[in-house]
Amino acid sequence: MTQLFSGFSAQTPSLTDLDGRARDIFRRVVESYLETGEPVGSRTISRGGVQLSPASIRNTMQDLAQLGLLDAPHSSAGRIPTHAGLRMFVDGLLEVGDIGEEERRTIESRLFAHGRSFEEAMGEASAILSGLAGGAGIVVTPVREGGVKHVEFVALGADQALAIMVFDDGTVENRLMKRSAGVTPASLQEASNFLNARLRGRTLNEAKTEMAAELDTARRELDATAARLVEDGLAAWSGGDDPDRALIVRGRANLLADASAREDLERVRRLFDDLEQKGQLIGLLDDVRSAEGVRIFIGAETRLFSLSGSSLIAAPYMSGRQKVLGAIGVIGPTRLNYARVIPLVDYTARVLGRMMDG
């Protein structure tokens, strides 16, 4: 069974505050809203088999609104759950099942595709969740703790080379480079030896700083082609404000799929702005690293999503030694299909962790 952790600590109404009738109507309102995205009226509830008059249902829905669990958008006669209502539903009424065997095979086959690097696997995991869950898939890469163990340049055809950096923790980073004319196997080996002598044991950030500082030395001590390889290697490994922590987002277009009303488009625009806040998103996903299961953040529970009214469902992925490596999840509107997305995120995180173990 998927283990869930609330992303919200503020006090909200409890299920014990509701009698059986109120609990049943509340559940039906939330389930209908999550399915359709439309405000739910008393007639919709009565057609669902509730043995109460529309007037009695309206009175109960009004009571739920006074508790802060339902709200009436604009002039609509229907109700939608508030963020507090969604939290109570997710924590107390949501029935989370499991994913199907076909989806399990899809996730495993795509992540364990032959020759896929760790970087490619994390991007693929994000894309998988985006496709299966209908939101934007998001992955934060592991914190790089190990030092550089080995650097190597490998020829790939006549005009390309691969810069390979192996770390003490066993992970491998690859960068594709343009191979200049005249680069020989001897030049590739000379450049590799030069960098190995200077970078071994350093973190990736330290290695990049050292490579930049050693360019003049390379130009003096190496032949022209080997020196150029070192320079090109520096260019290939540079870039990004926080190179040790990458944030991978796939499926932004999914967020536009059901945004028909103008206010929905404004919400999505704000969510797109949220997705550009790399530091804040990484910080939020780092909070997930301390959880032992799927964690759910709903709307205004987090400062980041307070304007866009979005939800994040995320889980840590970890090595076989139970070391937390990073976090993966799905971002979307608060009416995400929680019952479906939660087990998808949980299983994808587990498979990604196995893949990272090799």
Curated annotation (Swiss-Prot):
Key word Magnesium present: no
Keywords attached to this entry: Repressor, Stress response, Transcription, Transcription regulation
Name of a matching Pfam family: HrcA
SUPFAM superfamilies registered for this protein in UniProt: GAF domain-like (SSF55781), Winged helix' DNA-binding domain (SSF46785)
GO terms of biological process kind: negative regulation of DNA-templated transcription
Keyword Zinc-finger: no
Gene Ontology molecular function: DNA binding
Family: Belongs to the HrcA family.
NCBIfam families named in the record: hrcA
Protein name: Heat-inducible transcription repressor HrcA
Lineage: Bacteria, Pseudomonadati, Pseudomonadota, Alphaproteobacteria, Caulobacterales
Gene name of the encoded protein: hrcA
